[in-house]
């Protein structure tokens, strides 16, 4: 009876109830969808880090990460490699030579970490070979008499290996992408012009386009104007095993693009055989072994086993290599719950205000109910149920809308191309696929019910304090 009465009371003032319900719906929808976008970005970041950058476990000399000394190689590397491969749970392992050096072109230079790899085993551990930008080459797949290097897009831009141009073919491509005629006319003034750097290109383009045009079409213009000459050259210089400076000219095998601009800027991959010739290291001298597991959940178990087997070496899991990723994955659920609690706390004030108005408007009615024998517990429960119903209707509607939108955007994703540089500078992808677990919806529903109950306490107590005789005299 109380449940039915409370439900009818919610709709006695439809306008007021709908205002509260709509505000709750918008709040829940915005909160849940924002959480889905953030969760999708973080899951993609972790997935990219494990598949393209660091894999699951690293093995190296205990002092190697302090200064990346070329002398700190893994002793008995063949035996260590065999031990790792024989450990249950290990899917693949690759060996690397790691040295620090400088990458130079005729106009620019940058500090880099040079990684000597075997392309075949590297493909088994990481998927960096799949990130090669079309038209720039490949991952050491084409035979060449030159020494080759596989570099990141950010480094290629810094060294002016990637340049920008605007000509008739670029303008035609932009027209095919349905850019407005007025934008094409503005860009036509640069027809036939080549830009030496991304900075100069952006400066010139910004000079002729409005802020709105830059925001809407900047990413497309940059993509079409992008220019690369196959097998461009750069020089790598570094110290050999005898601490003598050495170096060589490398041709660009390909350019990779991932969502981490810092990684792109600092990591240069070359063939191990080429690097060992230049450094004087032996064919079995490796600084690092990268391990890929069959199952991510077995990381701690496998690392513990390897630490026991390889006690003289440092064995680090991906959580130890990049603790910020570990923190995100471990704390993410708590953070999202706190985020939703803050939103619901703000919405609770609206519910409290509405229920206080309800009590004020129905003072005479509540006094009459008390006078004819309805006890205080029933009055309290009725007010509480009205608040819970308001919260649930708005909350469930918000959840349904957010679930629908998340499902529709999860397949195609949300493209933040206009903010790609900012996202990549922080190591996040600019194309995000929202995702959220079903358990989170359950958590939100429980929080909504709790919000309704807590929001009803003060108004319900106010109702209980009403004197029936005074309330009946209220007009």
What role is predicted for each listed range?
Residues 16-40:
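Short, strongly hydrophobic transmembrane alpha-helices
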Residues 31, 35-113, 119-145:
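Hydrophobic, regular-secondary-structure patches
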Residues 34-40, 335-371, 379-384, 452, ...:
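A hydrophobic alpha-helix feature that marks transmembrane segments and, especially
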Residues 97-167, 171-192, 252, 272:
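The feature marks short, hydrophobic/small-residue-biased sequence motifs that occur predominantly
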Residues 190-336:
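Mechanotransmission and gating elements of multispan inner-membrane complexes involved in transport
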Residues 331, 381, 396-443, 457:
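Short helix-loop junctions at transmembrane helix boundaries
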Residues 356-358, 364-410, 443:
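Transmembrane alpha-helical interface segments in multi-pass membrane proteins
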Residues 436-475:
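C-terminal membrane-exit region of the final transmembrane helix in multipass inner-membrane proteins
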């Amino acid at each position: 009876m109380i449940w039915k009465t409370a439900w009818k009371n919610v709709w006695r003032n439809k306008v007021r109830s709908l205002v509260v319900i709509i505000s709750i719906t918008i709040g829940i929808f915005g909160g849940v969808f924002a959480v889905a976008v953030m969760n999708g970005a973080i899951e993609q970041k972790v997935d990219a880090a494990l598949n393209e950058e660091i894999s699951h476990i690293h093995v190296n000399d205990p002092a190697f990460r302090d200064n990346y000394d070329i002398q700190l190689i893994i002793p008995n590397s063949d035996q260590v490699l065999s031990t790792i491969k024989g450990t249950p749970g290990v899917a693949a392992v690759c060996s690397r030579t790691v040295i620090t050096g400088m990458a130079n072109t005729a106009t620019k230079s940058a500090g880099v970490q040079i990684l000597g790899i075997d392309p075949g085993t590297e493909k088994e551990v990481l998927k960096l070979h799949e990130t090669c930008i079309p038209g720039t080459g490949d991952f050491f797949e084409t035979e060449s008499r030159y020494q080759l290097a596989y570099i990141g897009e950010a480094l290629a831009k810094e060294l002016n290996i990637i340049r920008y141009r605007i000509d008739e073919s670029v303008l035609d491509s932009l027209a095919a992408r349905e850019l407005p005629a007025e934008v094409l006319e503005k860009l036509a003034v640069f027809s036939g012009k080549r830009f030496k750097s991304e900075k100069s290109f952006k400066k010139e383009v910004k000079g002729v386009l409005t802020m709105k045009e830059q925001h809407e079409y900047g990413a497309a213009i940059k993509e079409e104007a992008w220019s690369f000459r196959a097998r461009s050259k750069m020089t790598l210089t570094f110290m050999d095993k005898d601490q003598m400076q050495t170096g060589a000219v490398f041709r660009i095998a390909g350019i990779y693009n991932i969502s981490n601009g810092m990684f792109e800027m600092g990591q240069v991959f070359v063939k191990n055989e080429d690097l060992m010739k230049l450094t004087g290291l032996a064919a079995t001298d490796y600084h690092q072994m990268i391990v890929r597991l069959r199952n991510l959940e077995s990381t701690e178990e496998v690392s513990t086993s390897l630490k026991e087997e390889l006690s003289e070496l440092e064995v680090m899991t991906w959580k130890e290599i990049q603790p910020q990723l570990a923190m995100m994955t471990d704390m993410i659920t708590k953070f999202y719950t706190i985020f939703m609690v803050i939103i619901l706390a703000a919405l609770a004030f609206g519910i409290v205000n509405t229920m206080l108005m309800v009590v004020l408007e129905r003072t005479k009615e509540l006094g009459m109910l008390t006078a004819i024998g309805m006890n205080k517990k029933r009055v309290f429960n009725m007010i509480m149920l009205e608040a819970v119903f308001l919260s649930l209707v708005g909350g469930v509607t918000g959840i349904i809308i957010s679930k629908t939108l998340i499902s529709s955007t999860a397949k195609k994703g949300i493209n933040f191309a206009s903010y790609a540089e900012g996202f990549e500078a922080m190591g996040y992808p600019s194309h995000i696929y929202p995702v959220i677990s079903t358990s989170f919806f359950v958590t939100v529903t429980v929080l909504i019910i709790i919000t309704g109950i807590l929001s009803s306490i003060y108004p319900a107590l106010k109702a209980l304090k009403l004197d029936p005789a005074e309330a009946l005299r209220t007009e």
